[in-house]
Amino acid sequence: MALLKVKFDQKKRVKLAQGLWLMNWFSVLAGIIIFSLGLFLKIELRKRSDVMNNSESHFVPNSLIGMGVLSCVFNSLAGKICYDALDPAKYARWKPWLKPYLAICVLFNIILFLVALCCFLLRGSLENTLGQGLKNGMKYYRDTDTPGRCFMKKTIDMLQIEFKCCGNNGFRDWFEIQWISNRYLDFSSKEVKDRIKSNVDGRYLVDGVPFSCCNPSSPRPCIQYQITNNSAHYSYDHQTEELNLWVRGCRAALLSYYSSLMNSMGVVTLLIWLFEVTITIGLRYLQTSLDGVSNPEESESESQGWLLERSVPETWKAFLESVKKLGKGNQVEAEGADAGQAPEAG
C-alpha cells in the first residue's frame, strides 16, 4: 500500500509544478548563500592559519562550498523539470531520469544534513588545532630574524590586540617560553647570565608578557614585566589586584569566535536543508501523480501521488534485496572473469 497517498487533478498538478518551480529558484539562491558562508569561513580560517596546527579545520568550509555549488546545479535542473512537467512531450524526455534524479536528491539531502551537523561538532577538533598552533606560534615569536618565521611576532601581537587575549590559555603561558630574541639580550649582564644558567634548557625566561597583552582600558600604566614581583611596583599585589592584562587566553577567544560563526552557519544550513527536503518531497509527488495519469493526452484526468509506493518496512526490505542482487551479480561476473583467465594461464 502506498504511503501518504494524495489525489491530484489537473489544477492541483499545475499548482504543484508552479510552486516547485518557484521554490527551486529560491533554493538556487540558498545554494549561493551556502557557498558564500563556506567561502567566508574559509577566508576567516586562512587569516589565522599561522596559529593552526593542521588543515583539518577546512573540512567544514570546503564542504559548504561544495554543497552550495551542487545545490545551485540540482535546483536549476529541478526548476527546468518542473517547467517542462506539464507538457506531455517534454515530460516524456525527463521521465526515465526522474527516479535516479530523486535518489540523488535524497543522497544530497543526507549529506547536507551531515554537513550542518559538522558545523556544530567541529569544536573539539578546532580546539586541539588552535591549542597546538598557538603554542608553536608563541615559541616562534622571538624568531624575527629567521626566514619563514619573521612574521610570527606581528601575527601574535595583532591576534592578541584584536581578540583581547593573552597567551594560549592565559598570560602565564608567556612565562614558560623565551619570547625575547637573543639579539636583544645583553649577555655581558649578570642578570641575563644568571637567568640563562638557572634554566635547564639555557633559555631566558621572565615573568613578563609582550606589550600586546596590555589592556588599554586599565587606568594604571601597563605592568608587563616582573608581573609576579609585588616589590617591583608601587601599591601592587598580583594575587589580589585586577591585572591590567587580558585575562582570557587566545585559544578560548578564537574558539568562541569560530564556534559562534559555525553555529550560525549550522542553523542556516539546517533551515536550507528543511527547504530542500520539502522540494524533494514535492518533486516525488509531482513525479508519481504525472506517472499515474492513464492517458497523457487527457490532461484533465485525476491521478494519485504518493511518497513511497509501499510501506516503509516493505520499501526497506525491497532496497536490501536489490543491494543483495547487485552484490551477487558482481560476484558472478568476477567468477566468470576468473574462469575465463584460467584456460589462458594453462
From Swiss-Prot:
Q: Which PROSITE patterns match?
A: RDS_ROM1
Check the record and name the SUPFAM superfamilies matching this protein: Tetraspanin (SSF48652)
What changing R142W does, per the record, is:
In RP7; also found in a patient with central areolar choroidal dystrophy
**GO BP:** cell adhesion; detection of light stimulus involved in visual perception; photoreceptor cell outer segment organization; protein heterooligomerization; protein homooligomerization; protein localization to plasma membrane; protein maturation; response to low light intensity stimulus
Pfam families tied to this protein = Tetraspanin
* Keyword tags: Cell adhesion, Cell projection, Cone-rod dystrophy, Disease variant, Disulfide bond, Glycoprotein, Membrane, Retinitis pigmentosa, Sensory transduction, Transmembrane, Transmembrane helix, Vision
What GO MF annotations does this protein's record show?
protein homodimerization activity
Q: Does the keyword Disulfide bond apply?
A: yes
Effect noted on mutating R13W: In RP7; in combination with a null mutation of ROM1
Q: Where in the cell is it found?
A: Membrane; Cell projection, Cilium, Photoreceptor outer segment; Photoreceptor inner segment
The record lists the effect of R172W as: In some patients with macular dystrophy; also in a family affected by central areolar choroidal dystrophy
Cytoplasmic side of membrane: 1-24, 81-99, 291-346
Enumerate the Lumenal topological stretches: 44-61, 124-264
**Which Gene3D superfamilies does the entry mention?**
Tetraspanin
Record's bilayer topology term = Multi-pass membrane protein
Q: What outcome follows a substitution of R220Q?
A: In MDPT1; increased protein expression
The transmembrane residues are 25-43, 62-80, 100-123, 265-290
**Role played:** Essential for retina photoreceptor outer segment disk morphogenesis, may also play a role with ROM1 in the maintenance of outer segment disk structure. Required for the maintenance of retinal outer nuclear layer thickness. Required for the correct development and organization of the photoreceptor inner segment.
Q: Subunit notes for this chain?
A: Homodimer; disulfide-linked. Forms a homotetramer. Forms a heterotetramer with ROM1. Homotetramer and heterotetramer core complexes go on to form higher order complexes by formation of intermolecular disulfide bonds. Interacts with MREG. Interacts with STX3. Interacts with SNAP25.
Disease with which this protein is associated in UniProt: Retinitis pigmentosa 7: A retinal dystrophy belonging to the group of pigmentary retinopathies. Retinitis pigmentosa is characterized by retinal pigment deposits visible on fundus examination and primary loss of rod photoreceptor cells followed by secondary loss of cone photoreceptors. Patients typically have night vision blindness and loss of midperipheral visual field. As their condition progresses, they lose their far peripheral visual field and eventually central vision as well.
Similarity annotation = Belongs to the PRPH2/ROM1 family.
Question: What protein name does the entry list?
Answer: Peripherin-2
Native organism is Homo sapiens
